[in-house]
C-alpha cells in the first residue's frame, strides 16, 4: 500500500513538473537577448541570472540568440541573421544596435512581431525603444559605498580617469570629503602616467582605485601590483582577477521592467541603469 501511495505521489510530482515546463515553454512570453562575440565576452553571467529570475516573475522567459562575426559583414547578412530571431521582446546589445543604426536598418520593421529594444546612445526610430546608458548612476553608487566603507580607516580612495572622457567626475567627487579622495587625471596621454600614478598611490597607501575610463588602463598591469580596482564591466578582463575589487554593470532587469509596456513603433527612450557589483 505504501509503495502504491509513493508511486502515485511521484507520478503526481512528475506530472506537475511536466505541466509547469509546458507552461514555461509555451504560455510565457519570451525575451530574446541578441548577443555577439563582444557582448558575450564582457557581460557578467550574474547579470543574465538576475535578468532570468526577474523576468520569470513577470511571466517572461529569457533566451539568447547569438550573431556571429559574419553577420556584420554587410547589411544583408545582418538582416538575414537578425531576421531569424523570435520573441515577444528582442533586446539588441550595443554592437548590434550601433551596427543597425550605422546601416540605417529598421529593426522594428524587420522584426514586426516583436517589441525591439536597443542599447544605444540616443533616441532612434529604427527601434521601438532605446535604452540609453546611464553609467553615472553606477559610479555614484560605487563612490557612495567606498566612501562609507573607508570612512573609518586611514586610507584614501583613488579616482583615476582620462581627461574629458568622464563627464560625471564631479558627481563622484561629491560623495567624498576632500581629504578622502585622491584624484589622478590622465591629461598627458603619456604612458608614464600609469607608472607615476602607481608610485603615488603606493606612497599614499591607497588600496582601491575607481577607474570609469582610461584608454591606457592596461599600462597599469604591466608589472605585478597590489592596488585593487573598480572598473566598467567592459574592461574587467584587463584587470588581473586578484586585483579586481568590483565592477559597474548594467541592470538589465530593472531597466527592462520600465519598458515592457512599450508599444510597437513608439520610438521610446528610457535609461539603462547601472549597479555596483563588489567581487
Show the residue positions of the predicted features.
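Hydrophobic membrane-insertion alpha-helices, especially the h-region
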Residues: 9-23
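Extracytoplasmic "Venus flytrap"
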Residues: 32-76
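Periplasmic-binding protein-like
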Residues: 34-35, 86-97, 117-119, 158-161, ...
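Short, well-structured alpha-helical segments in soluble
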Residues: 72-88, 106, 190-204
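Flexible loop/hinge segments that line or gate small-molecule binding clefts
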Residues: 105-133, 234-241
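Short beta-strand elements at the ligand-binding edges of bilobed clamshell
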Residues: 123-148, 240-253
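An alpha-beta-alpha
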Residues: 137-180, 266-279
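Flexible loop/turn connectors
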Residues: 227, 233-279
